[in-house]
Amino acid sequence: MKLHKKKLTLFAFFILTVLTVTLKTYFSYYVDFSLGVKGLVQNLILLMNPYSLIALVLSIFLFFKGKKAFWFIFIGGFILTFLLYANVVYFRFFSDFLTFSTLNQAGNVESMGGAVTASFKWYDFVYFIDTIIYLFVLIFKQKWLDKRVFSKKFVPVVMAASIALFFLNLAFAESDRPELLTRTFDHKYLVKYLGPYNFTVYDGVKTIQNNQQKALANEDDLTKVLNYTKQKQTEPNKEYFGAAKKKNIIKIHLESFQTFLINKKVNGEEVTPFLNKLSTGNEGYRYYPNFYHQTGQGKTSDSEFTMDNSLFGLPQGSAYSLKGDNTYQSLPAILDQQQGYTSSVMHGDYKTFWNRDQVYKHFGIDKFYDATYYDMSEDNIENLGLKDKEFFKESADYLAKEKQPFYNHLITLTNHYPFTVSPEDASIEKPNTGDSTVDGYIQTARYLDESLEEFVNELKKKGLYDDSVIMIYGDHYGISENHNKAMEKLLGEDITPAKFNDLNRTGFWLKIPGKEGTVDKTYAGQADVMPTILHLMGIDTKNYLMMGTDLLSKDHNDTVPFRNGDFVTKDYKYVNGRIYDNKNNEPMTEKPKDFEKRKQQSEKDLQMSDDVLNGDLLRFYDNPDFDKIKPSEYEYKTGPKGQERK
């Protein structure tokens, strides 16, 4: 018995392996992964999240007997270690985590051999020191092992405890980051809250689901959608068709902007004086006050997706995250193939957020200027990333060097929840609603307005303003229904369901060189932007699959569907199962004659778009006007040295 006490039991070896793999995971969190951990709750989650899957996987091998059990636990621990280390090396180079989608592109590693080698660090032995020790014991010191059968009645207890710990971890994660699994944020979020091993399981489940949906799809499904979208198409306005052919296109994303801010005064001051000027129709802009966002859970990523593809985001999660590997016929790619445009995106956040570094390759976007191209010193950072003024200042310099004609998309950040701005950047007093979110929103919106004005002035100085098509739009609402009481104080009116629907107007400003501005009260949404731009460029759209219609067309369809099933028209809105008159936002006593037709169309638009995404239907489409995008031809390098198409 004394001899047995000195030996290493199977359960002790199990505990040791769980602890060492967990410790290595902690080491990676703080040394190699940049997870942006803040506060007590997130640190507690970080301590918790590796254990559950490590213990659950390794506990399975406790059912085995003798030497086999030791070896299986060792192999299990080694596989987990290898997965961790593979993520470490991948993260050092790509600032992202391995997914099953990226493993399908493993052939690219051969061409990056030098870069992968450069990703090795001197301290990497830490990840394998326990593996070496365990291997030495298993081969040369078997006499140290107690090979007696482990009592299997304890194994279910260990497994149950592991599963319970996972759900506790998930509960903490959901409390700190609601809708974590359904909205599928940046992979860093998922790893921070779930750990690298649970993230791999999650990614595997999502991959299987996506593959199953794709596997069932066929060309007949595509034909149904094409037949539907072709009968939706409208004739272009002759006055505008080709009016901006081969003009530079600058698309400016106003983060979380809502049109109630236009002409709004707080303490006697205009919140957005510059945008107010652009909204008069006297500054060369067509202003669309009845332009709505059509995003779902993907929010910003959905707005990008919808405007560049004229498809809707998914009912759950982000299309960028879940359908990023699909085949697309995007606006920037069409402009490239039809008129030789180069395309770029500029954003003061890191390229992996919302899976942009992968999605943009499938959109055929040539260049991506992410945070690594900007001065990200502490003084220039606010909230999620680079301050808008610094972002626009540096972006203008990059833009001046772009090959023309170009299609450029600039994504701002400062006017983002929780709407904080440093005292030196706050140029308007907060209102006094008692809600820090609503009060802060006024200050960050003013800062955004000032930033935009400075950028426009820079464009004028660089000779890029007058002869460019300029689009300005709000991507999604900033103030949710949770802040209705404060909004009632700010606006001086009740926030009914109909009024909240009105607050989903995010605005669209369109400057067309050589054309006068106006206030256009047409009802429209983000899906309508792509066909509008293509017609302005003089591009025939009959062979492109799009859910929206040309804003400038006399036959524009003014039914605006929303991802939650609501919709709005120029006369009425359908919200939460009730119909409201747009004139007074009062419930309508009689159903409009065209209501059922509009409702069915709205539902079908969403369903057809979902079918395209879930079945990856565009892979079947041999469009005579479009060559399929080859994602492997695009690579987005880390700044500031620039990036070029291969």
Swiss-Prot record:
Family label? Belongs to the LTA synthase family.
* Protein name as annotated: Lipoteichoic acid synthase
According to the UniProt record, where is the region Disordered? 579-646
Q: Name one GO cellular component term.
A: extracellular region
**Enzyme Commission designation:** 2.7.8.-
- Domain of life, per the record? Bacteria
Query: Which SUPFAM superfamilies does its entry note?
Result: Alkaline phosphatase-like
Could you name the active-site residues?
Answer: T300
User: Which species does this protein come from?
Assistant: Staphylococcus saprophyticus subsp. saprophyticus (strain ATCC 15305 / DSM 20229 / NCIMB 8711 / NCTC 7292 / S-41)
Listed GO MF terms:
metal ion binding; transferase activity
* Comp. bias intervals (Basic and acidic residues): 580-607, 625-646
Q: Which Pfam families match?
A: Sulfatase (PF00884)
